[in-house]
Amino acid sequence: MSIVSSVAFVPRGYASEFPKSYDIDEIEYERINQLSKLKLEDARADLQSSMEDSNKANGNGEETTDGAEGVLQTSEEVDDELKVYNLDTYDDDEEEAETEGPAAMFSNIRGLAYHENGEKDPYITIDPQEQDDLEREEMQILPTDSLLLAARTEDNLSHVEVYVYEPTEENLYVHHDFLLPTFPLCLEWLDYKVGTSDNAPGNYVAVGTFDPEIEIWDLDIIDAVYPAAVLGAGASQVNKKKKKSKKINDSYHTDAVLALSSNRNAHNLLVSGSADTTLKLWDLSTCNCVKSFTYHSDKVSCLDWYSKAPSVLLSGSYDKTAKIADLRLEEAPSSFQVTSDVENVAWDQHSENNFFIGTDNGIVYYCDARNLSKSVWQLQAHDGPISCLSVNPSVPSFVATGSTDRVVKLWNTSDSSPKMVVSRDLDVGRVFTCSFTTDESTAFHLAASGSKGVVRVWDTATNPGVRKAFESRVTEEVTKKERIVQLEDRGAGEDSSDDDDYEDIEDDDDQDAEMS
């Protein structure tokens, strides 16, 4: 069983052309040593907790007497087993002759050919330099390549896959990956070199999981064993020592990290939302928490910085509110109330003051930050919870939504009566995540994935309905056949034979979305 819980595109121009292999020097060794100590302390805390639970269950530490307990062997029984397998005479065996047994294979060692250093072996036909060049070429990331990140869990093993997407070749493949300690919930790409104060550009990803820590990985390093940084390091160990009281604090989260958002104006700032109901602002130059906020009364599920004002943040929560806060001010944030848990929030990047809200009951709200007494419009977008909502950064009024009803829908929100352009089952199972690319040249490309564990990239410009709705923005020549790219031979995680059939809405049959 394999599922993908989150996907994210990396803008072109940030990835290294030739990613480096993981190298352990003295500095890295010392850093790993410190991280390992934290992991060891976590393991000790787990062991101590298990022993305490066992003692409580048994009553004052006494052993249980049910039939499941093991029976100790007597010394006579142990001796009998040694005799059966001749283990008592194991050290007394005579050495075998050189011409008999395993040693015989080395008896003709004098006849083996030996080549001096630098001398060519006639049986090795591949030039080492040629082999190195071939391997280097295979790892090369071209300027025309796009990187796509996918958080995958398969058979209780979680990792982040770094895909290379070649739009012109219609090719998608895994370039490298790295393991995670637990189930991933969200990904956020970072353009800041973590741990430095020189504001240098970087290529990193922050990962939120069921653990309270946030791991940050360098995407330009292959076969990395440990993350480049851990925000809130040691929080798990503290929580395990004080399980009964997960007290909220100003330094780290005490529960799962559900949402992350990087500030594209102040590049060293990252904000996180957690099941502990708090938001935390992190300084990536020091990897420390700058400030903690308690705007919500339930789990914080989604976040989005306002691109036109670096200090303004939009957040959504299971307390059925979306809130707008200026993090520089102490005053209470503005709030918009909805009828169900908030699953997604996103600013409309092409409108000055508007934003979207996606909820657990399938409704999408479009709001104006200047008037939160009512929404501009709202629509019943899906039959199930809206698990993902992506606003196209390059094409105005182009929005994608996905749901556990297994459908991805594309919307034209150019006026007060939004229209559904396409409704498509991409055969990814229950849709958990979708995201438009951030590059202008591939503006119509949408990645989606879900409960089947299959990652698909859909060139929506090849759909007739999309071309008609956004004809002024479709500049490239497109084929009549729709293009949906996926990783070949990837096993599906579940049977989709009972999926409903959905048809595109094309030509003159654009249908108005159901308005509430």
From Swiss-Prot:
Residues 47-62 have a biased composition (Polar residues). Keywords: Cytoplasm, Nucleus, Phosphoprotein, Repeat, WD repeat. PANTHER family: PERIODIC TRYPTOPHAN PROTEIN 1, PERIODIC TRYPTOPHAN PROTEIN 1 HOMOLOG. Residues 482-493 have a biased composition (Basic and acidic residues). GO terms for biological process: rRNA processing. One of its GO terms (cellular component) is nucleolus. Residues 495-516 have a biased composition (Acidic residues). It holds the Pfam family WD40. SUPFAM superfamilies: WD40 repeat-like. The keyword Ribosomal protein does not apply. Residues 46-74, 482-516 are annotated as: Disordered. It is found in: Cytoplasm; Nucleus, Nucleolus. This is Uncharacterized WD repeat-containing protein C17D11.16. Coiled coil: none annotated. Gene3D superfamilies: YVTN repeat-like/Quinoprotein amine dehydrogenase.
